């Protein structure tokens, strides 16, 4: 060390030496030469001190490492001694059996062999040969029949102290007291888990000491095991699943904690295996009371529910619909005694609304929690409270039982287990602030079985033409890299269709060029050249640069100029996709003859020629020359591996039909390469086999919602880092893969968010608020959401519900709001449906009521789903390159033109000038009555998938009308009384006549339009010019879409279901409304003027009340609507108006013939100045005191005293006619149907 730090030492600390580059490092030499003498001394002192410090730290690390090694050796030796001390003998170990035989019936030979082994070991057997022979018949029958789940009671893992150790194995039990010595446990080990299969030892375990650090729900009870007989192929497959190796760890965490979080990447097996772990542990078994509840598993998508339910049933060897069932929106298959139930999160949310404690369940698994769907977030918040409440109820019941009380089986409550499972779980959202869980649940991370995926970032990020860059990268992969499927992520259907069309065209051109080159090569071969290659051209190519030869025959056929300097340790390095114009232009083909050979893969003759030239020039190869046949065989292998063949390009997006989606799973021919162009639906929903390369554009189309204006917009935005990881993982499902990201690492690190926003932050929460209110949660802002919505969104939702009359002015739930909460749909749609039921209930004995209800349900389904009418030619700009128009062939243009004319004809066929919703409802009716639904959609330009889903939704809503709104559950005014569900379906199935395209009458269409107005009363627009409107919610003008059915009529007032911003704000789902509908169904949005004197107040015999006229102003823009009649609020004004109507004969018609006998005009009662007159003032005063302002109130007063108002009305007659009042009075009492006592 002294020699290193001596005074004469000029020490210089330098970084590690890099690889030698071309040229000298002039900058470093210049810096070294500029060092002066004065700085050397100070630097020397500084370096000396640094070296001493480094040496001291290094010695400490070495000493510390030596000490740690010694401690490990001591611990290892102690462990070995302890194991040797209690090692069982070989005679005893031979009696041990594998755990796989548990639950399997032994044969006669196996039982005798087992008895002989026990006898040799000196262990007495309980059963003799005779007992074995007696059970032979049973054993044989068990072998012939399929094995059913078997229940075996064992004790749960208990924890044993030093003084009570036991060694237990199946039929052989050796107590610690009989052992040669007593087990000594190290101080670092607190407990040892113990499992036994003997019922005789239960009493001996009661006194064992429990660990205080372990959270246990309730007292320790016997466990329950369900033995499963799986198919052989399932057992083989399960061995490769990482989560199977962690079964014990997972089940221990579930048994000890009320909530558990399991995190594992896609493919680890958590979705299918965790329910099986619980099933085998006794959950869902009716024979084990504390775990008899169903195992419930939620998925955010219906397709995942069906797939996982079928897979789990197959792996357990049971029938789907018996032990394992499922329930989705349109389908249900579950038995009464099912143990496992798969369902969507919306199904469980409806169940928790009816039974908050979820008494039917013992375990709830929320899968795909990282997606943060709206329903899943609500369920997490509710279930955390359910866990606590059920635990408290359980403890109370246990105390009651210990004190001698009794609890019926129906009222028995057991603890509930909650399991959150996710691929990329943001744990901080669930455990931060202890808002959800007072005690942080354990997090179990499951390793993945994913193959390694090499990530390639682009050096530059293309902002505009990223579709063009994706096309170039796909073609580059196809031409240069080995076989393997390519998955391309784009944003929407338009981009998918455009890129697919462009790739198919390029694939055809490659095939044509290959055919031409094959013909050219064949012609050269016929000329007698060496192996079909001109030796002169080969010699010139060889003499140009010998390095190019190595480049051409590199192991992967890539140009070295394309290799980047990224640090990647896989076979393929990061590629620079932007280096040369030659690489950017995929249409360019090399002119050189040898280049055409390389592109075609004709390497046999070319390599032989190069070998011959190399030998001629003295570059003798170390290996002997290969035969021509061997060279041809090797060249053929290279050709088959790297030659660019035909591309099989397939689209994949959500609106694609199921049959078209399944095409991506079909096998690809040997000479083809699969290319799937998909939206983000391929991130998690589907796993496409054979994908080796992923091209990620880094974009996604998101739907943004502005809670203040209610305007929605589709925008192309960057994906999150979590989504990027999901996309890259698609390349590593079947083998090592590569992901080419068309953006730089700087963009990924600095611009991409860590994860996407939860759905609750991006959608309206009016349905959430209504659900909370219906479950007696008045203050929604205090609910424990994992991510609470914005306060402004909550206020906007409450304003919307008040406009829909679901909430009163104080925020309380109205009877209408309670009925709306029973429907699993948006509050707007349920308001519309209930309005139809209310109005038809008021119209009694209407023969066509069932038909109107059928169309009402169809209109609700139409407004709930995207428009099924295909709009391919909206005029919106496609995201395509500049030469897109040049690439479209003339026949394609003509085909699109014909398609456009067909769609326009379909619009005219179904178009209803009053409502877009009724237009779609008519199309749905025609679709269902047609014999060929697929042909109908093809002929009329309709989306088959949307129409099919709309038909299913209509049927479900119709069942809800008859099941949800029963008189015992809701107000009787919301129940259907005009017929049964069969009557509605029969009326709906009628076919329209040729003279009319719709069976509905005009008044019936107006009734449905009024119901739509009730559901969207706060989304009103008023016409300003042509198709331009002013909406209530926004200041800027909005427009009717040119595909709307109302585009030609353009009514003065309309409501819309959606305001979508593209190049301008367009209204979708528009319906014409009348001004009186707004006042009737949206009074909270109206401001009324003072009662008008002209027209004067009047009495309505239909409503039996007096009304006055006012001028309403609607919405924030104060639109003045036509005069509207409302009830009079002032008591004296109301009494005076009723008295005027009574004298005019409007209340009792018998007075009309006596109007000429009156001494004054009845209208004077309406003038406050005339109330000073005796006959006017006395009548108004009595009417006010007696609260007589309706015919009903007048009748009740006359039944008590028939002479009420007699004197006050008599003075209104002229004196010479007052003698006729007595007879008139008897007629008035008779007409009022006064029942005299």
UniProtKB/Swiss-Prot annotation:
<feature type="region of interest" description="Disordered">
    <location>
        <begin position="115"/>
        <end position="148"/>
    </location>
</feature>
<dbReference type="InterPro" id="IPR014001">
    <property type="entry name" value="Helicase_ATP-bd"/>
</dbReference>
<dbReference type="Pfam" id="PF04408">
    <property type="entry name" value="HA2_N"/>
</dbReference>
<feature type="domain" description="Helicase ATP-binding">
    <location>
        <begin position="251"/>
        <end position="443"/>
    </location>
</feature>
<keyword id="KW-0067">ATP-binding</keyword>
<feature type="compositionally biased region" description="Polar residues">
    <location>
        <begin position="24"/>
        <end position="38"/>
    </location>
</feature>
<comment type="similarity">
    <text>Belongs to the DEAD box helicase family. DEAH subfamily.</text>
</comment>
<dbReference type="InterPro" id="IPR011545">
    <property type="entry name" value="DEAD/DEAH_box_helicase_dom"/>
</dbReference>
<feature type="binding site">
    <location>
        <begin position="264"/>
        <end position="271"/>
    </location>
    <ligand>
        <name>ATP</name>
    </ligand>
</feature>
<dbReference type="InterPro" id="IPR007502">
    <property type="entry name" value="Helicase-assoc_dom"/>
</dbReference>
<dbReference type="GO" id="GO:0016887">
    <property type="term" value="F:ATP hydrolysis activity"/>
</dbReference>
<dbReference type="Pfam" id="PF21010">
    <property type="entry name" value="HA2_C"/>
</dbReference>
<protein>
    <recommendedName>
        <fullName>ATP-dependent RNA helicase DEAH13</fullName>
        <ecNumber>3.6.4.13</ecNumber>
    </recommendedName>
</protein>
<feature type="region of interest" description="Disordered">
    <location>
        <begin position="543"/>
        <end position="585"/>
    </location>
</feature>
<feature type="region of interest" description="Disordered">
    <location>
        <begin position="1"/>
        <end position="51"/>
    </location>
</feature>
<dbReference type="InterPro" id="IPR056371">
    <property type="entry name" value="DHX37-like_C"/>
</dbReference>
<keyword id="KW-0347">Helicase</keyword>
<dbReference type="GO" id="GO:0003724">
    <property type="term" value="F:RNA helicase activity"/>
</dbReference>
<dbReference type="InterPro" id="IPR001650">
    <property type="entry name" value="Helicase_C-like"/>
</dbReference>
<keyword id="KW-0378">Hydrolase</keyword>
<dbReference type="GO" id="GO:0005524">
    <property type="term" value="F:ATP binding"/>
</dbReference>
<feature type="region of interest" description="Disordered">
    <location>
        <begin position="876"/>
        <end position="910"/>
    </location>
</feature>
<dbReference type="InterPro" id="IPR048333">
    <property type="entry name" value="HA2_WH"/>
</dbReference>
<dbReference type="InterPro" id="IPR027417">
    <property type="entry name" value="P-loop_NTPase"/>
</dbReference>
<feature type="domain" description="Helicase C-terminal">
    <location>
        <begin position="605"/>
        <end position="776"/>
    </location>
</feature>
<dbReference type="Pfam" id="PF00270">
    <property type="entry name" value="DEAD"/>
</dbReference>
<dbReference type="Pfam" id="PF23362">
    <property type="entry name" value="DHX37_C"/>
</dbReference>
<dbReference type="InterPro" id="IPR011709">
    <property type="entry name" value="DEAD-box_helicase_OB_fold"/>
</dbReference>
<feature type="short sequence motif" description="DEAH box">
    <location>
        <begin position="367"/>
        <end position="370"/>
    </location>
</feature>
<keyword id="KW-0547">Nucleotide-binding</keyword>
<dbReference type="Pfam" id="PF07717">
    <property type="entry name" value="OB_NTP_bind"/>
</dbReference>
<feature type="compositionally biased region" description="Acidic residues">
    <location>
        <begin position="567"/>
        <end position="585"/>
    </location>
</feature>
<dbReference type="Pfam" id="PF00271">
    <property type="entry name" value="Helicase_C"/>
</dbReference>
<dbReference type="GO" id="GO:0003676">
    <property type="term" value="F:nucleic acid binding"/>
</dbReference>
<dbReference type="InterPro" id="IPR002464">
    <property type="entry name" value="DNA/RNA_helicase_DEAH_CS"/>
</dbReference>
<feature type="compositionally biased region" description="Acidic residues">
    <location>
        <begin position="131"/>
        <end position="143"/>
    </location>
</feature>
């Amino acid at each position: 060390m002294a020699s290193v730090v001596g005074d004469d030492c000029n020490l210089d600390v330098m970084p590690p030496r890099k690889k030698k580059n071309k040229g000298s490092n002039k900058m470093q030499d210049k810096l070294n030469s500029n060092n002066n003498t004065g700085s050397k001394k100070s630097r020397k002192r500084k370096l000396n001190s640094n070296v001493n410090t480094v040496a001291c730290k290094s010695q400490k690390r070495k000493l510390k490492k030596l000490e740690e090694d010694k401690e490990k050796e001591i611990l290892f030796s102690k462990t070995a001694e302890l194991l040797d001390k209690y090692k069982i003998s070989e005679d005893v170990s031979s009696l041990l059996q594998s755990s796989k035989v548990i639950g399997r019936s032994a044969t006669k030979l196996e039982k005798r062999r087992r008895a002989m082994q026990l006898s040799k070991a000196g262990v007495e057997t309980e059963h003799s040969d005779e007992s074995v022979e007696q059970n032979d018949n049973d054993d044989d029958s068990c072998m012939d029949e399929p094995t059913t789940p078997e229940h075996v009671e064992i004790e749960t893992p208990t924890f044993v102290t030093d003084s009570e150790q036991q060694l237990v194995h199946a039929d052989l039990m050796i107590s610690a007291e009989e052992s040669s010595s007593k087990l000594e446990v190290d101080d670092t080990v607190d407990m040892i888990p113990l499992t036994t299969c003997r019922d005789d030892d239960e009493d001996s375990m009661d006194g064992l000491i429990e660990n205080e650090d372990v959270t246990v729900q309730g007292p320790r009870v016997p466990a329950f095991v369900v033995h499963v007989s799986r198919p052989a192929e399932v057992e083989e497959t399960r061995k490769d699943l990482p989560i199977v190796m962690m079964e014990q760890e997972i089940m221990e965490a579930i048994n000890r904690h009320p909530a558990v979080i399991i995190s594992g990447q896609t493919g680890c097996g958590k979705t299918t295996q965790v329910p099986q772990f619980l099933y085998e542990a006794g959950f869902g078994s009716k024979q084990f009371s504390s775990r008899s509840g169903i195992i419930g598993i939620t998925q955010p998508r219906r397709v995942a529910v069906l797939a996982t339910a079928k897979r789990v049933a197959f792996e357990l060897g049971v029938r789907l619909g018996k032990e394992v069932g499922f329930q989705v929106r349109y389908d249900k298959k579950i038995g009464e005694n099912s143990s496992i139930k798969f369902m969507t999160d919306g199904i469980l949310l409806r169940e928790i609304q009816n039974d908050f404690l979820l008494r039917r369940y013992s375990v709830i698994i929320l899968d795909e929690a990282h997606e943060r769907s709206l329903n899943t977030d609500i369920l997490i918040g509710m279930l955390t409270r359910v866990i606590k409440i059920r635990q408290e109820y359980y403890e109370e019941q246990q105390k009651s039982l210990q004190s001698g009380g009794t609890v019926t089986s129906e009222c028995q409550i057991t603890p509930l287990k909650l399991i959150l499972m996710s691929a990329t779980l943001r744990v901080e959202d669930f455990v931060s602030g202890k808002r959800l869980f007072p005690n942080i649940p354990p997090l179990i991370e499951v390793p993945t079985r994913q193959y390694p995926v090499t990530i390639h970032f682009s050096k530059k990020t293309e902002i505009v033409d990223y579709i063009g860059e994706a096309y170039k990268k796909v073609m580059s992969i196809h031409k240069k890299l080995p076989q393997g499927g390519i998955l391309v992520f784009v944003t929407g259907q338009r981009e998918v269709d455009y890129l697919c069309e462009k790739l198919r065209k390029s694939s055809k051109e490659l095939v044509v060029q290959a055919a031409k080159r094959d013909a050219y090569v064949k012609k050269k071969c016929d000329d007698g050249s060496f192996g079909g290659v001109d030796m002169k051209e080969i010699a010139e190519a060889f003499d140009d640069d010998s390095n190019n030869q190595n480049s051409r025959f590199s192991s992967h056929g890539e140009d070295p100029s394309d290799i980047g300097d990224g640090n990647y340790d896989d076979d393929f390095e990061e590629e620079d996709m932007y280096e040369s114009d030659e690489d950017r232009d995929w249409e360019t083909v090399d002119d050189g003859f040898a280049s055409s050979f390389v592109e075609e893969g004709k390497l046999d003759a070319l390599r032989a020629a190069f070998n011959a030239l190399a030998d001629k020039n003295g570059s003798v190869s170390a290996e002997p020359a290969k035969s021509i046949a061997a060279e041809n065989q090797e060249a053929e292998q290279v050709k088959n591996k790297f030659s660019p063949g035909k591309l099989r390009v397939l689209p994949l997006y959500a609106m694609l039909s199921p049959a078209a989606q399944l095409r991506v799973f079909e096998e690809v021919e040997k000479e083809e390469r699969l290319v799937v162009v998909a939206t983000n639906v391929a991130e998690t929903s589907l796993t496409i086999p054979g994908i080796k390369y992923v091209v990620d554009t880094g974009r996604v189309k998101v739907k943004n919602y502005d809670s203040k204006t209610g305007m929605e917009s589709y925008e192309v935005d960057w994906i999150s880092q979590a989504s990027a990881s999901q996309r890259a993982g698609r390349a590593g499902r079947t083998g090592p893969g590569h992901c080419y990201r068309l953006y730089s690492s700087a963009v990924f690190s600095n611009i991409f968010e860590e994860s996407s926003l939860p759905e609750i932050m991006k959608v309206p929460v009016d349905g959430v608020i209504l659900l909370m209110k219906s479950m007696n949660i008045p203050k929604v802002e205090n609910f424990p959401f994992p991510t609470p919505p914005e306060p402004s969104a909550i206020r906007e939702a409450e304003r919307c519900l008040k406009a829909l009359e679901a909430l009163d002015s104080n925020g309380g739930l109205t009877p209408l709001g309670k009925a709306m909460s029973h429907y699993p749909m948006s509050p707007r749609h349920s308001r519309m449906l209930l309005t139809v039921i209310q109005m038809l209930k008021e119209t009694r004995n209407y023969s066509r009521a069932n038909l109107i209800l059928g169309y009402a349900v169809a209109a609700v389904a139409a407004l709930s789903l995207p428009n099924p009418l295909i709009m391919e030619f909206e005029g919106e700009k496609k995201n395509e390159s500049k030469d897109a128009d040049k690439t479209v062939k003339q026949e394609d243009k003509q085909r699109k033109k014909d398609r456009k004319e067909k769609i326009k004809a379909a619009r005219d066929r179904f178009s209803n000038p009053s409502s877009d919703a009724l237009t779609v409802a008519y199309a749905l009716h025609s679709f269902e009555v047609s014999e060929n639904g697929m042909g109908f959609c093809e002929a009329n330009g309709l989306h088959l998938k949307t129409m099919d889903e709309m038909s299913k939704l209509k049927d479900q809503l119709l069942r809800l009308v008859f099941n949800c709104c029963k008189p015992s559950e809701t107000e009787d005014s919301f129940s259907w009384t005009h017929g049964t569900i069969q009557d509605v379906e029969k009326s709906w199935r009628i076919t329209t006549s040729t003279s009319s395209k719709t069976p509905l009458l005009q008044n019936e269409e107006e009734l449905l339009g009024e119901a739509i107005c009730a559901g969207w009363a706060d989304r009103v627009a008023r016409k300003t010019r042509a198709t331009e409107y002013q909406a209530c919610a926004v200041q800027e003008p909005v427009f009717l879409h040119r595909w709307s059915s109302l585009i030609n009529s353009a009514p003065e007032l309309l409501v819309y279901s959606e305001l979508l911003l593209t190049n301008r704000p367009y209204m979708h789902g528009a319906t014409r409304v009348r001004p009186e509908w707004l006042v009737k169904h949206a009074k909270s949005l109206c401001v009324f003027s003072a009662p008008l004197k002209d027209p004067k107040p009047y009495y309505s015999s239909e409503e039996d009340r007096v009304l006055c006229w006012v001028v309403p102003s609607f919405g924030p823009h104060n639109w003045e609507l036509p005069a509207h009649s409302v009830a009079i609020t002032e008591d004296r004004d109301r009494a005076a108006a009723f008295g005027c109507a009574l004298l005019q004969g409007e209340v009792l018609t018998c007075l009309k013939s006596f109007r000429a006998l009156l001494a004054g005009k009845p209208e004077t009662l309406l003038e406050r100045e005339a109330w000073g007159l005796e006959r006017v003032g006395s009548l108004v005063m009595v009417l006010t005191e007696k609260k007589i302002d309706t015919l009903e109130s007048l009748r009740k007063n006359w039944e008590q005293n028939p002479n009420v108002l007699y004197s006050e009305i008599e003075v209104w007659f002229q004196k010479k006619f007052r003698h006729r009042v007595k007879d008139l009075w008897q007629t008035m009492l008779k007409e009022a149907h006064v029942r005299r006592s």
